[in-house]
Amino acid sequence: MGGLWCPGWRLVASCGRGWRQPGWSGRTVVNAELVLRPGWDGLGGAERGLRRLGTWKRPCGVRGPATQPPRRPRSSNPFQRAQEDEWRRRNKTVLTYVAAAAVGMLGASYAAVPLYRLYCQTTGLGGSAVAGHSSDQIENMVPVKDRVIKVTFNADVHASLQWNFRPQQTEIYVVPGETALAFYKAKNPTDKPVIGISTYNVVPFEAGQYFNKIQCFCFEEQRLNPQEEVDMPVFFYIDPEFAEDPRMVNVDLITLSYTFFEAKEGHKLPVPGYN
């Protein structure tokens, strides 16, 4: 029989002798005989017997129910620990780069449109006319009489805007270094005030860097009352350097196009420097 049952205790019980363990009272010996009996084998029997005696204590190396799963112990191998630390450092670096790239792409998406328009306005690329002329430059220009250029005009209206918009002339002939004046006409046929705003471009695109507008109605809000009709002037010139550019040798036709959109009051397109 296992547990804490000892043959000597059975002998004491059967012979009726007053045997006792040193330090134990007689009552404790009797209690031991009563609680440590056959059938209580193994560690389970010992634990139940000691609980009945009131002397049971949990062994030092035994823990209670775990409140959380044990952590994975770090490797005792120095090389493996260094490798794990290196992987953690690399993962943090990659996450930092990914987050920075995401923020940068978000900022670039907001700034792309105004920056591209400003770039086109400065360089003339993308079919945008160049601003930044001065009165002295205009007064000192020398017309290139033997280089006649045909300028045609086009007008479009976005589906959101219920306006009638058209050029008053279909074409004019100019020479580089000479100013020219053209007109567009816009009408609001509705029964309520409408605010419109226009953009423009020049074709061919390469000619945009030489097409300078002194005065126009683009990128500015235009408010038309019900049934109101207005004339919109465009005062422009073609830079004399147009005639000296080898790329413009075969260019004798330039088209200026305007497109009107409906705008909310107080809204302006973020393109500085346009006239």
Curated annotation (Swiss-Prot):
InterPro entries: CtaG/Cox11_dom_sf (IPR023471), Cyt_c_oxidase_assmbl_CtaG (IPR007533). The chain crosses the membrane at residues 95-113. One of its GO terms (cellular component) is protein-containing complex. Keywords: Copper, Membrane, Mitochondrion, Mitochondrion inner membrane, Transit peptide, Transmembrane, Transmembrane helix. GO terms for molecular function: copper ion binding. Residues 114-275 are mitochondrial intermembrane. It is found in: Mitochondrion inner membrane. Residues 57-86 are annotated as: Disordered. Its main location: mitochondrion. The gene is Cox11. It comes from Mus musculus (Mouse). PANTHER family: CYTOCHROME C OXIDASE ASSEMBLY PROTEIN COX11, MITOCHONDRIAL-RELATED, CYTOCHROME C OXIDASE ASSEMBLY PROTEIN COX11-RELATED. Exerts its effect at some terminal stage of cytochrome c oxidase synthesis, probably by being involved in the insertion of the copper B into subunit I. This is Cytochrome c oxidase assembly protein COX11, mitochondrial. HAMAP family: CtaG. Belongs to the COX11/CtaG family. The keyword Transmembrane helix applies. One of its GO terms (biological process) is ATP biosynthetic process.
